[in-house]
């Protein structure tokens, strides 16, 4: 038997902890994919949740949306309940087929929430609609609980403003869908503003497509090399970006911060 991976051991430890703590409800996020993921060992769930599916982790999950959707839909349980976000037609077909095979009930949260939410970004309204629908199928959660939860949600690193002067937004977009959502949010909230773009990426991501989607939005781009063995070099990323925006410069993170930081008296945390 192969030795368990660190993630598998962490998952086992987490399940043991949840049992010892006698948790009422546990929210479990898949590590990668779903069908073959360690978290999918549980035989039954209150609800299986599938958020927006896009091209990511192709080395492990497949090279088409349908293949990735097949892996993701593996979390669907026999006779279970499934809530899914808005999906591409080809993805929804895979999810519907899996539900049919397992006699699972499918709810499509394909609108946006009507409640006020604390997070910027139109895609967050879509995410909130999914969360809203899930909560409606958990005993003891009222509409008022849902409303209060959405307005008080904090999600670091997702179109998060961390500074006012200048306005400094951080976002963890690392795949094609995330890049598209970031573009939508920038155009909606900062369409008439000068954008300075600081970016770094892992080499195993679809960085050329990410560059194609986001680079034209900026007046100036600085590329950095993330502190990670999987990192794409700043020079290589700058070369990819230059096809879509010539005003790009590969720098160190320290240099970049010197270029872009306001004076200390101007810094105000939001």
Residue ranges and their predicted role:
Residues 2-5, 82-84, 169-170, 196-198, ...:
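Short catalytic-loop micro-motif centered on adjacent basic/acidic residues
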